[in-house]
Design a protein with these regions (language model features):
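Rhodanese-like catalytic fold shared by cysteine-dependent sulfurtransferases
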Residues: 2-4, 16-31, 61-145
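Flexible, polar/low-complexity N-terminal or interdomain linker segments that lie immediately upstream
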Residues: 6-63
């Protein structure tokens, strides 16, 4: 009996995680989204005064100028993100992206955006990658490292 409970626990934990994510509202709004086209133009703009801080919070490739944090679906990753954010002015434009998968399945964007909200960032953005980084950024020829 104990053997079966041990085998079933991960399944129940996963189901709980999925149902919780499905019922919780996203911590971002449509006004918090930035299109790939807009970010690409900001990256290629010669005016460095309006450059955003771009944080890669997933396992995907590096967009030009982004800082690699890595996955934040674990305490170590959340700690790295929190530490990096502590060095950034709250009014600075901060754009996060993961690009591993569609938003509904992504384990990284919700925790990252929640931290941005809790820390009081006023110009926080989520890069709009509804499918993944390859389809929504790389295949369209936007700048990579």
């Amino acid at each position: 009996m104990a053997k079966y409970l041990i085998m079933l626990f991960p399944i129940f934990a996963l189901m709980s995680f999925i149902s919780r994510n499905a019922t919780e509202p996203n911590p971002w709004t449509t006004k918090d989204m930035v299109s790939p086209e807009k970010l690409s133009s900001l990256i290629q703009d010669n005016d460095k005064s309006n450059d955003p801080i771009i944080l890669n919070i997933g396992p995907s490739g590096a967009i030009k100028g982004s800082l690699k944090i890595g996955s934040v679906d674990n305490p170590k990753g959340l700690g790295l993100l929190t530490n990096r954010l502590s060095k950034i002015q709250k009014s600075k434009m901060v754009i996060v992206y993961c690009g591993c998968c569609p938003y509904d399945n992504c384990p990284n964007i919700r925790p990252a955006f929640t931290i941005l909200n809790k820390q009081g960032f006023t110009n926080k953005k989520l890069l709009d990658l509804p499918v993944n980084l390859k389809v929504d950024w790389i295949d369209k020829g936007f700048p990579m490292e």
